[in-house]
């Protein structure tokens, strides 16, 4: 599986989330298959976005697009870090 891990700070989580949700269709059309949103334990505006993509090339193209740069600015995203990952292994433990 192909993953993108994004770590960034936002000015206001509620505003960011509203804009993030409004971009669902364009993310899906670009190749995002699923996502999870996390926050740092004691920093509510420090966001981690982990998503599964159909390909890392599509993800890179999407995240570097001028349209998304504008969306990030509107959403108050500060200094995003993008990490492109290929899954090697998954493990589960029986309980």
Question: Which residues fall in each region the model found?
Answer:
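Glycine-rich beta-strand-turn "strand-cap" elements at beta-sheet edges
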Residues: 2, 30-48, 70-95
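Short, well-ordered beta-strand segments in beta-rich or mixed alpha/beta enzyme
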Residues: 2-9, 36-65
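Generic structural motif
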Residues: 11-13, 56, 87-88
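Short amphipathic alpha-helical segments
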Residues: 12-36, 67-70
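Compositionally biased, low-structure terminal segments
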Residues: 21, 63-64, 83, 93
């Amino acid at each position: 599986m192909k993953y993108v891990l994004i770590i960034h700070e936002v000015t206001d989580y509620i505003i960011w989330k509203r804009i993030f949700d409004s971009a669902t269709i364009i993310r899906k059309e670009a190749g995002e298959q699923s996502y999870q949103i996390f926050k740092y334990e004691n920093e509510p505006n420090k966001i981690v976005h982990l998503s599964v993509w159909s390909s890392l090339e599509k993800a890179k193209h999407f995240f570097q697009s001028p349209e998304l740069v504008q969306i990030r600015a509107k959403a108050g995203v500060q200094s995003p870090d993008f990490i492109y990952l290929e899954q090697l292994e998954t493990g589960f433990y029986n309980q």
